[in-house]
Amino acid sequence: MLRAWQDVIVKWRLVPDDLPGNDPEGAQHADLARSALLDGRLDDALTEFGHATRLRDHPLDQVGIGDVHLARGRWDEADERYQRALAAGGAAALLARLGITQVLIGEGRAAGAIADLEHLVADRPHDPTLRYYLASAWYSVAEQSRSRTADDTLVITSEQQLLICEQAAERILTLKTGDDELDRGAEHLLNEVAMGRRWTWAPEGIAVSLAVLTVAFGLITVVAGGLMGSALVVIAGVVVGAGLLFAIVWRFRRQTWRRRADEMASEITRKGV
């Protein structure tokens, strides 16, 4: 699934309004199709792009038909149209490449789209449209990497997922797309990562009680050894108390993300990376 409807259509900003053409009627149908697509009227867009393809052979029409299929989740049909446009080259090739990356994202393979988008942004670092697509892809990577419950709650269940979310959020913010939704999402991801790395006791009540008892045992043993004048008892109290305290910390002190992952384990329906 794509992150947002605009991921289908934003790439059309890259098309100049004064593209040359030798078939006025075909161009007219293409303009109507593009307008319908941008308005979300997919049936009208498909009809008009179809008329255009019967009157002319233009790769942008293939991109447009691919976008209709993309919006409807027909990944194979969309990819076929984008590949045709890519093979034709010209101004449509860039849009076709972007379309192919969106197919990968829609198929749940967002990580596979990152390399090509990073190359595009490296070639044109000041292009806001390309930066937007890269940021959106990174957000999809973060979504697809996490585990998911039946009600579509995303849960970090591995250290790798934690690192991916952090990397994605930082990259989104450095791209400075100006998209409020993406920026808020990235900031939320960073907060989730920070919260996930916090240490906590699990289960808290038992851990705290055992820690208190262990410290008390150590103090009592040391005091008793001192009153008895036995250095051996004092040393034993210190060593045993320290060992027990270490064991409690090792057993019960966990990062928040691990604790939540354990709590949600029975509800996970799709595991992440």
Task: Label the model's feature ranges.
Residues 20-197:
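Membrane-protein extramembrane domains
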Residues 199-264:
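Transmembrane alpha-helical hairpins and terminal membrane-anchor modules
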Residues 5, 12, 75, 138, ...:
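A residue-identity detector for tryptophan
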Residues 1-21, 238-248, 273:
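Long, contiguous interaction/recruitment modules in multidomain scaffold/adaptor proteins
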Residues 21, 25, 29, 262-273:
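N-terminal topogenic membrane-targeting module
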Residues 8, 15, 78, 141, ...:
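Enriched - but not universal
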Residues 9, 193, 197, 268-272:
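Short, flexible helical or helix-coil boundary motifs
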Residues 1-15, 165-172, 182, 269:
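Generic low-polarity alpha-helical segments
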